[in-house]
Design a protein with these regions (language model features):
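C-terminal motif of bacterial Sec signal peptides marking the signal peptidase cleavage site
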Residues: 18-20
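Intrinsically disordered, low-complexity segments enriched in polar/charged small residues
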Residues: 10-13, 211
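Bacterial N-terminal signal peptides that target proteins for export
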Residues: 1-10
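Residue-level signal for mature regions of secreted extracellular proteins and peptides
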Residues: 14-15, 151
Length: 226
């Protein structure tokens, strides 16, 4: 009888140990709110944390940037798979990669010679890349503070009004974008835009991924199937 009690005691202890292991929080390191709290262009800047499934993501409304994206690998070990800076100052002062994790636009990629004609009107834009206009010009969507419409556990909605004539582009362009995480560990980006006159729009996102985890070496041995 004593042996039976001892056996059940071992089983119970093992079960409790497994339960405790299964309920442990994933080992992730989040950027602090204090490191991203500031003001730019008269608007408040902060950082927002989203969680769903096994994924945790942090976004700042300065440039609508994804600054971290934590997800487990096949062994269950968590890594931050996007590159990002630890403080908002690094983004604002732009002492590194300008478009790191940001929304780019209102026209992503290059416009030859910084000029285009639309409905018979020629528009001239700032030149910022070897004689071309790149990713919206000198002050594109990556260098503005987005207004937060709503923030929940798994979704962040932001908007920005790109004014008529801003960086040379025609039309008041109202842009809304949504970052979402799903229970299936999906990371979604949804854009919408409306304008009050004909214009050119090509919105995009500029993350830098390292599926080994930030700081864990080169990506040259990555294999991607599309």
């Amino acid at each position: 009888m004593r042996k039976s009690k001892a056996l059940w005691g071992c089983v119970l202890a093992a079960a409790l140990l497994l339960a405790a292991c299964g309920s442990q929080e994933p080992k992730i390191t989040l950027f602090s709110n204090e490191a991203f709290q500031t003001e730019a262009d008269g608007k408040p800047v902060g950082i927002y944390t989203l969680r769903a499934g096994d994924v945790t993501m942090q976004v700042t409304n300065y440039g609508a940037r994804v600054v971290s994206l934590w997800t487990p690998d096949r062994a269950g070990d968590y890594e931050d798979i996007v590159l990002g800076y630890e403080t908002i100052d690094r983004y604002i002062n732009n002492d590194g990669e300008r478009f790191l994790g940001a929304v780019v636009g209102p026209y992503a990629n290059r416009i030859a010679k910084g000029s285009f004609t639309l409905d018979g009107t020629e528009y001239n834009l700032p030149i910022n890349n070897n004689g071309q206009t790149l990713h919206g010009g000198i002050d594109g969507l990556d260098r503005v503070v987005w207004d937060v419409v709503s923030a929940s556990e798994d979704q962040l909605v932001m908007k920005y009004l790109h004014a008529d004539g801003q960086e040379g582009f025609p039309g008041n362009l109202q842009i809304e974008m949504t970052y979402s995480l799903t229970p299936e560990n999906e990371f979604r980006i949804d854009y919408s835009a409306t304008t009050d006159k004909p214009t050119v729009v090509n919105l995009s996102h500029h993350p830098f991924f390292n599926l080994k985890g930030e700081g864990n070496g080169t990506i040259l041995d990555h294999v991607m199937t599309i």
